[in-house]
Amino acid sequence: MEKFRVYGQSTLSGDVQISGAKNAALPILFATILAEEPVKLTNVPELKDVDTTFEILRKLGVVVERTDEQTVLIDASRIDRYVAPYELVKTMRASIWALAPLLTRFREGQVSLPGGCTIGARPVDMHISGLEKMGAAIELDEGYVKATVNGRLTGTRIYMDKVSVGATLSLIMAATLAEGVTTIENAAREPEIVDTADFLNKMGAKISGAGTDTISIEGVSRLAGCEHSIVPDRIETGTFLIAAAISGGRITCHNTKADTLDAVIEKLREAGMQVDVTENTITLDSLGQRPKAVNIRTMPHPGFPTDMQAQFTLLNVVAEGTSKITETIFENRFMHVPELIRMGAKGEIEGNTAIIHGVESLSGAQVMATDLRASISLVLAGCIASGETVVDRIYHIDRGYEHIEDKLRGLGARIERFSE
């Protein structure tokens, strides 16, 4: 199993190119199932989850070709299988996004109940109930979600009991080829939903309201091909801004959008960091100062993103003062805290809240990654700790961070990948 060895006490400074957003690339890749003509996607990150999505698409009969590091050509015109199999789906919860496009285009689809990060229940119930409201017949059989419909799905009003990015995306995809108008109320508002809707509209969909809590989709009879560039990864951007903040450095992130990170930037400034933005860059200068502790409460967009919680936990670990971090989106998302305590952090977990008491320094240790965002916080902790840190189970990182050790080395980190 591969691990990272990180040698600490590094100041991370320099320039870094931000990759395309994993959380936009995955739904857009699954949405290509809807297209009857070839699609060209650019700014597609090289990630384990993206590769898994390619394999699922190929199992369905989709032709997928990566022509260079950033460009992918996809032809879904000859899909002849409608099952996303367990051996692929088990590693990635996003696989559920195959169901809605298969169902609305081909009247049937089967997806194995998905896997992925172990951070709470993350049920697929909202995906299923929404599809049922549109006329689908759903059954759970031998670990598979099986969906069928006689004729086209039917547009309807769907109120989401809970804000869900995954279910919002599923229902948008389903509604594109449904008969009539579908209205999704209490919809998620994330930038990746806006990007997916922009992609679908380029193919001929009629979606309005993406980025608000009410999305309207007027069904069309077919979707064509198009070209589309994946939006920059706001979570990767935030991660590198944290890297500068905790190490006393100065980092400029290129190919990014500050307007997708308002809550994160506000908290970084509250922590005493200097943050400057242009149209396509964000620069954080720590001014060589230790950050101040900041309270965090994760919320659906435009609130503070849950995918930045672990990184801000690390910031608070080495900050001046005591902070309270409240996680409202997922269960079990403080599994990085005991690992940071092994490195000298001070804090305790009370239900969905972590109380962190800032310390001046950390010490290297052997730690274990438990999910994608927790794992990157442990790597960054290793960059600033004294001595050597070994991070186990780094396959989590490869699911969501493109060429992470190369990018960190470019900023001054001493990090190597090895196998045991």
From Swiss-Prot:
It is an enzyme of class 2 (transferase). It comes from Actinobacillus succinogenes (strain ATCC 55618 / DSM 22257 / CCUG 43843 / 130Z). This is UDP-N-acetylglucosamine 1-carboxyvinyltransferase. Pathway: Cell wall biogenesis; peptidoglycan biosynthesis. GO terms for biological process: cell division; cell wall organization; peptidoglycan biosynthetic process; regulation of cell shape; UDP-N-acetylgalactosamine biosynthetic process. Belongs to the EPSP synthase family. MurA subfamily. Phosphoenolpyruvate binds at K22, N23. The active site is at C117 (proton donor). GO terms for cellular component: cytoplasm. HAMAP family: MurA (MF_00111). It catalyses: phosphoenolpyruvate + UDP-N-acetyl-alpha-D-glucosamine = UDP-N-acetyl-3-O-(1-carboxyvinyl)-alpha-D-glucosamine + phosphate. InterPro entries: Enolpyruvate_Tfrase_dom, Enolpyruvate_Tfrase_sf, MurA_subfamily, RNA3'P_cycl/enolpyr_Trfase_a/b, UDP_GlcNAc_COvinyl_MurA. Keywords: Cell cycle, Cell division, Cell shape, Cell wall biogenesis/degradation, Cytoplasm, Peptidoglycan synthesis, Pyruvate, Transferase. Coiled coil: none annotated. It is found in: Cytoplasm. UDP-N-acetyl-alpha-D-glucosamine binds at R93, K162, V163, S164, V165, D307, I329. Its EC number is 2.5.1.7. One of its GO terms (molecular function) is UDP-N-acetylglucosamine 1-carboxyvinyltransferase activity. The modification 2-(S-cysteinyl)pyruvic acid O-phosphothioketal is found at C117. The keyword Endoplasmic reticulum does not apply. Cell wall formation. Adds enolpyruvyl to UDP-N-acetylglucosamine. Gene3D superfamilies: Enolpyruvate transferase domain.
